[in-house]
């Protein structure tokens, strides 16, 4: 299942200066997905879902949270379209939008986002609806990258063995 090699990711740099003014470092933009998606509203899906995920997991900076309080409230209630927050923010993500932990996640996961998005919603990933049920499917993938793979649960055999041993001791 080959993915387009045309997709490129903006690297995250520290803020730089131009003529003495600080420039915000762009992390990703809707333009990164526009060619593959074919339409602006569809190109917003991967990063819109990603930004909603970051909001749900408190990976956004205090400044971002303060500036987008109204849209974040709708995200927490899962109201409206998932990409509304991303659209309201100008369809561009900046390094300053994230907490330090958020930036670590962004640096580690954003290069993988397109592949996970395409694999989760194949064959026509950009034809999905902008809704919370689709968001949840991708969020289930993203959480593994944020928290790591789930650890295997302790087998009930170990617990059962402990119970049998204790019951046997009581009968003696």
Predicted segment positions?
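N-terminal low-complexity, intrinsically disordered segments
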Residues: 2-14, 18-80
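Glycine-rich, aromatic-bearing surface loops/beta-hairpins
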Residues: 155-172
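Intrinsically disordered or highly flexible coil/loop and linker segments, enriched in small
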Residues: 59-63, 95, 99, 152
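Compositionally biased, intrinsically disordered low-complexity regions
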Residues: 5, 14-20, 99, 112, ...
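Polar/charged low-complexity regulatory segments
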Residues: 28-30, 35-37, 54, 134-150
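Amphipathic protein-protein interaction modules
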Residues: 76-146
């Amino acid at each position: 299942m080959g993915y387009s090699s045309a997709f490129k990711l903006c690297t995250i740099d520290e803020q730089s200066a131009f003529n003495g003014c600080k420039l915000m470092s762009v992390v990703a933009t809707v333009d990164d997905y526009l060619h593959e998606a074919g339409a602006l509203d569809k190109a917003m899906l991967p990063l819109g879902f990603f930004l909603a995920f970051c909001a749900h997991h408190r990976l956004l900076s205090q400044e971002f949270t303060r500036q987008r309080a109204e849209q974040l409230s709708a995200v927490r209630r899962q109201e409206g379209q998932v990409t509304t927050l991303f659209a309201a923010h100008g369809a561009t993500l900046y390094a300053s939008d994230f907490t330090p932990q958020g930036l670590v996640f962004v640096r580690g996961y954003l290069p993988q986002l397109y592949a996970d998005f395409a694999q989760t919603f194949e064959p026509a990933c950009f034809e999905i609806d902008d809704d919370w049920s689709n968001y949840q499917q991708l969020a289930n993938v993203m959480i593994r990258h944020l928290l790591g793979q789930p650890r295997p649960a302790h087998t009930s055999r170990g617990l059962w063995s402990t119970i049998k041993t204790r019951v046997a001791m009581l009968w003696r």
